[in-house]
Structure formats: structure tokens, C-alpha cells
Regions:
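ATP/NTP phosphate-donor binding region
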Residues: 8-9, 55, 65-67, 74-164
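Short Gly/Thr/Asp-enriched flexible loops that form oxyanion-binding sites at enzyme active sites
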Residues: 175-198, 347-356
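Interaction/scaffold regions that mediate signaling and macromolecular assembly across diverse proteins
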Residues: 139, 379-419
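Internal gly/pro-rich beta-alpha loop/helix module
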Residues: 203-280
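Short acidic, glycine-rich surface-loop motifs adjacent to enzyme active sites
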Residues: 167-182, 330-344
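Catalytic-core regions built around general acid/base machinery
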Residues: 164, 195, 351-367
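Accessory alpha-helical/coil subdomains and C-terminal extensions
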Residues: 98-99, 109, 118-121, 126-131, ...
């Protein structure tokens, strides 16, 4: 909504969003489509979409004149329905697509310029007829949200949906998901789904599915090929491997991270090589890391006991030690500290965190240390302050990603309460989250 003054004039002119209007200001005339006000925009700035496609804002003030020209379009959105049903070859493997939302399930409203959730898994499949040559597939939309709205409780819903599909005899599962928190979900599923017998691929898109530059088609085609035909029984992310449309990377779910806000090849393996390259055109799957779980005949188990009151705290110069008091008052049960370098926090400075950390551990609340460097591993013995923190009970999480450690601590706290048990579980490699040795050619790939 615009300001009361602007809205009063629009109502008087019987003008609404979608109408073509003319605005005269300072002897200049502007003509275009009246747009909704940007949510965080100025209440008195009228937004026009010009005929060239650009939006402009015009400040409404004394002397500004508005004329209605005609009604141009309605803002009412109708649900997109699949136009036809794809027919698959019964000789091909059966896979399942589970929809959770995100950009991959969104389209642009070019009139307003916004992206909104629109496509169901069925809609996406309809855009990719080549899928009928890869596998038979069934679709199930369990939610349609942008990934910033994902919660630990929704991870459990996804895990249960995946397990149900797998235990029905499906050969692989593809999960469509928003990219921003996709690696949190991939880590969560890696811990919650035990004895995984088939591949599970989380796939997203950096560009909405109706755009010419969308990465949806290639990402889904590669992910479908991966879960249908590979011998990998792991939770993986499957996204563009380069800026070009040549191949996707299958990256272990606990070692994958979004490393760019908008590039199509944003998801990279951290501290290890990707498990596979999946080539789009010829559908060749090249294994690039032989350390993976193979397909098997086990029944997947859902282990969804978690404690969601875990905080992920980033260390920065001047951080106030009292920030931890807030979390303690909120009864948080665990902390992952993203320290500097090898796992440092201010230990002997004027804003030392040492006493705050000691207080937390004395309450039998675990403190886990990761590095904001992303690559490499933390180490409790290289410098004296690190030794001090370690002696107080801080758990140094090897080369775990901060996001993975955050999710893992939730899962561990669902199974252990004593600090020694928690430490043992945090340092046990359950889903490839810890590598014994970080190889040099795993950096920036």
C-alpha cells in the first residue's frame, strides 16, 4: 500500500495496480504501468513500469498530476497446471522427485519484477521432456517455501518423506530445494537418514525456472541421471560444475557449500573432491572421488532426534562476551563458534571470551569450534590460546564446515547429554563430515 495521501488520489481516479497511468512532474511526463509499492520503499514514491521494462519511482509531492489512461492487466495469479502427462518407459528405473520449493520452483512476474513460488514438481517435469529417457518418476510436493524459511522441523518432514519413498522400492530420490540453505538440509539429511541404500540428490537453481538463463533443466536432468544410474548411496548436492552447461558436480551433503550469491556453479566441495561429474549431453557419470557409500539392499532408518536450540556464533573483532548470556537466558543447549584461523577467539584480551566459554561448559553445555576460513581444519595445539580453550573443554571439530557442525550438534544433542559422550559423537565421522587428511587439490575447486 502507498501512503494515505497517494492512495486517496488513486482511489479518486479509480486507479489500481495494473492500470496504465500518466504522471506529470516538473514539466516532465512519465507513462507506464502502476506497480505495487516495494515493501521497504518510500510510501510516497509511486512505482511505474515503463514500456522499456524498467521500473522507476516518482516522488509524490505538491504539483504532481496523475491521469489514468486505461486498465492494462490484472494482478490475479492463477495456478499453473501441467498441460499434459508424460509417458515413461517402464524398462527404466523408478525415481521420485520431492518438491520443497525455492527458486527452482519459482517464476518471475515480469510485470512486478518479483519472484514467487509457482511451479510444482509436476510443472518442472513438464519442462524437461528428456527426463522420460532417463527414468520413470513420481512427484510429491511436501512444501513450497523459499529456503530461508526452512527450519529443523521441516528437515524432519523431508527426511520422513525421503525414507517413505526409498522404502517403497524407489531407485533414487531427487529433492528440489532453494539454494540459500540447501547445504544445511543436505547435512541434516546426511545424519538423519541412516543405512541409506540409494542415492539422494538435493538440487536447486540460481535462476528461476521460466528464465532463458535458468539452470533448472540441466541441474534436474543431471540429478535424475545421478540418482537413477549411479552406484552412490549418499546424500549429495547436484548443481552446475562450471558457468557453462557442460556438467554438474555431485558433492557429498556434509561437504557442500554455497560459495557465491548468484553464479550457477555456486556449490563447491570443501576440503575434498566432488564424488562425481555428471555430464549433461551424453549423460556420462565420471566418478572423481572413490570414497563413497555404495548402493545396497538395506532399509533406510529415520533418526530424527534433534535438539534445535543450538546457536552458531561468528567471531569478529570486538565481539561482546555478553552475547552468550542472551542464548543462555533463552536456554540454548549447544554452541558452535566459528572462530578465526585455526579456531581462535579473544582469550587474553580486554574482551576475552574465555570466562564466558568456561561458564557455558560448567553448565554442561557443549562448545564446538570451527573456522570461518571455510577451507582447512581447526587445531587445538598449534598456539597457546588454542591449548587453553581445548583444556577448558572446547571441542575442536576437525575440518567440519560450520553449517555441518551446527546441524550435527543438533543431532548429537538428540542422542547424548553428557559432555564426554557429546565430544565422542562430534568427533566420530558418521556421514563423511570429517576427512582424515585435507588434500592440496581440494582447495578452490
Amino acid at each position: 500500500m502507498y501512503s494515505k495521501e497517494v492512495q486517496k488520489l488513486l482511489d479518486k481516479l479509480k486507479t489500481e495496480v495494473g492500470d496504465r497511468i500518466q504522471i506529470i512532474k516538473d514539466k516532465k511526463t512519465f507513462e507506464g504501468i502502476l506497480m505495487p509499492r516495494i515493501e521497504m520503499g518510500d510510501l510516497n514514491s509511486i512505482v511505474l513500469k515503463l514500456d522499456n521494462g524498467y521500473n522507476i519511482g516518482i516522488k509524490f509531492e505538491k504539483g504532481v498530476k496523475i491521469n489514468k489512461i486505461k486498465k492494462e492487466w490484472s494482478v490475479t495469479k492463477k495456478k499453473i497446471e501441467p498441460s499434459k502427462k508424460l509417458i515413461f518407459d517402464k524398462k527404466l528405473p523408478n525415481i521420485s522427485i520431492i518438491g520443497t520449493g525455492g527458486t527452482i520452483a519459482s517464476k518471475i512476474d515480469y510485470r512486478s519484477g518479483g519472484v514467487y513460488a509457482s511451479f510444482s514438481p509436476d510443472d518442472i517435469v513438464m519442462q524437461i521432456p528428456e527426463l522420460k529417457e532417463i527414468a520413470n518418476m513420481q512427484t510429491n510436493e511436501i512444501m513450497n517455501i523459499m529456503s530461508e524459511d526452512m527450519t529443523p522441523e521441516k528437515w524432519i518432514d523431508i527426511a520422513k518423506a525421503v525414507a517413505k519413498e526409498i522404502n517403497s522400492g524407489i531407485k533414487g530420490v531427487l529433492i528440489t530445494h532453494g539454494t540459500d540453505t540447501l547445504h544445511y538440509t543436505s547435512a541434516a539429511l546426511s545424519f538423519m537418514l541412516r543405512d541409506l541404500p540409494v542415492p539422494v540428490a538435493l538440487v536447486g537453481a540460481q535462476r528461476s525456472s521460466d528464465r532463458g538463463s535458468s539452470d533448472t533443466v540441466m541441474n534436474i536432468a543431471c540429478a535424475a541421471n545421478f540418482v537413477a544410474n549411479s552406484n552412490v548411496a549418499e546424500i549429495c548436492t547436484v548443481m552446475h560444475g562450471t558457468m557453462n552447461d557442460d556438467y554438474c558436480l555431485a558433492v557429498r551433503g556434509t561437504k557442500s557449500r554455497k560459495m557465491h550469491t548468484s553464479r550457477r556453479d555456486a556449490f563447491r566441495p570443501i576440503n575434498e573432491l566432488p564424488i562425481a561429474k555428471i555430464f549433461w549431453k551424453d549423460r556420462h557419470i565420471e566418478i572423481t572421488n572413490d570414497d563413497y557409500r555404495r548402493r545396497n539392499d538395506k532399509k533406510v532408518l529415520v533418526d530424527d532426534k534433534i535438539e534445535s536450540k543450538v546457536a552458531l556464533v561468528k567471531i569478529y573483532p570486538g565481539i561482546d562476551p555478553e552475547i552468550f548470556d542472551y542464548y543462555l537466558k533463552k536456554k540454548y543447549r549447544g554452541f558452535v563458534i566459528e572462530g578465526t584461523g585455526l579456531g581462535h577467539v579473544s582469550t587474553f584480551g580486554e574482551k576475552s571470551l574465555l570466562s564466558s566459554i568456561e561458564k557455558i561448559i560448567e553448565l554442561d553445555i557443549p562448545v564446538v569450534m570451527t573456522s570461518q576460513c571455510i577451507y582447512g581444519r581447526v587445531h587445538p595445539f598449534v598456539y597457546h590460546p588454542l591449548r587453553v580453550l581445548s583444556s577448558k573443554g572446547v571441542i575442536y571439530a576437525e575440518d567440519m564446515l560450520s553449517e555441518t557442525a551446527y546441524v550435527k550438534l543438533m543431532w548429537v544433542l538428540g542422542h547424548a547429554k553428557k559432555l564426554d559422550e557429546i565430544k565422542k559423537m562430534m568427533l566420530t565421522n558418521y556421514a563423511g563430515e570429517i576427512t582424515n587428511r585435507v588434500i592440496s587439490n581440494s582447495f578452490l575447486i
